[in-house]
């Protein structure tokens, strides 16, 4: 009985020690990522944040920061993935909705811009049109949720403009020509 208690105690201490070491490592990785973000080195920040999530994927803040870093790095699909994962952990964190809406709109723009060419003969495929439209619709849903949930949206006007721009694309998806403001 004493032996079993001793083994259980050693295992408990090992588990607690590992958890503490992981928490310290996660904190260090997140701090380093913040430094990289301040310097504009979003790729390095993303690497640190992903390593942090590999150690502890339960921190919604790390998912959010990874999403923001990915948006700034132009990695919109990665941003959407990170933000959706974080949103599952903390659906009442309103900033997820804003950043997710922005990432979705930016990815839609990227798909459209990749179709721009000098020969003007390239027509987007139906699959591309469908993806752009669904991204714009999802973007509007997330931006609208942000406005609903965000008690003091300082950037309300900017968000409403993005929603209007999304609507122009949704309504004109047959030609996908950017409508100038």
Task: Spell out what each predicted region is.
Residues 117-181:
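Terminal, low-structured helical/coil segments at or just beyond the last alpha-helical repeat
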Residues 52, 85-86, 146:
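Canonical positions in the second alpha-helix
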């Amino acid at each position: 009985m004493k032996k079993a208690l001793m083994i259980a105690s050693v295992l408990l201490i090992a588990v607690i020690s590992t958890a503490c070491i992981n928490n310290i490592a996660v904190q260090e990785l997140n701090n380093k990522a913040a430094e990289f973000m301040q310097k504009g080195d979003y790729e390095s920040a993303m690497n640190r944040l992903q390593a942090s999530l590999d150690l502890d994927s339960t921190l919604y803040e790390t998912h959010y920061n990874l999403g923001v870093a990915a948006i700034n790095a132009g990695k919109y699909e990665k941003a959407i993935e990170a933000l959706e994962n974080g949103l599952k952990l903390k659906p009442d964190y309103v900033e997820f909705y804003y950043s997710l809406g922005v990432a979705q709109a930016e990815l839609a723009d990227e798909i459209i811009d990749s179709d721009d060419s000098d020969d003007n003969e390239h027509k987007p495929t139906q699959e591309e049109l469908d993806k752009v439209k669904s991204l714009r619709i999802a973007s509007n849903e997330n931006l609208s949720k942000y406005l609903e949930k965000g008690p003091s949206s300082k950037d309300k006007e900017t968000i409403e403009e993005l929603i209007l721009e999304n609507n122009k694309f949704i309504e004109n998806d047959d030609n996908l020509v950017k409508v100038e403001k």
